[in-house]
């Protein structure tokens, strides 16, 4: 389980780093990086610091990591999935689709429902995986 947790944390770090530095697959845009002067960079630092704590101090270090991961998934839910499930105003939908218009989508963007792009779907899956593995380490 330790190896799985390390690999999941590394995968999440590398995947989320795309929010700092732009990732492309060929000419296709996966995510546009926002740089180090961004909320994304703060979140990456929080995740990295608490992940390190979880390995340096396993008896208590997993708790801050779990807190950061839960906070992160709640923020992501209200930025993406809340609008997918409950609907978005035309203005929100238009802004979201404009912001992510050039990114890779496995489900095409819609002008009726907010559909997260591939990057965010995988990001959310990795956060959830890390929550599960961290909770398992605490059990």
What spans do the regions from the language model cover?
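Individual transmembrane alpha-helices with interfacial aromatic-anchor signatures
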Residues: 99-126
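Membrane-embedded alpha-helical transmembrane segments of multi-pass integral membrane proteins
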Residues: 11-18, 46-50, 68-78, 126-133
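Alpha-helical transmembrane segments of polytopic membrane proteins
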Residues: 35-47, 76, 116-124
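Juxtamembrane non-transmembrane "cap" segments at the membrane-aqueous interface
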Residues: 80-101
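Juxtamembrane helix-break-helix junctions at the cytosolic face
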Residues: 48-65
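Hydrophobic transmembrane helix segments
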Residues: 10-41, 72-79, 84
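Membrane-interfacial loop-to-transmembrane alpha-helix junctions, especially the N-terminal start
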Residues: 2-8, 35, 61-65
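Transmembrane alpha-helical segments in integral membrane proteins
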Residues: 119-139
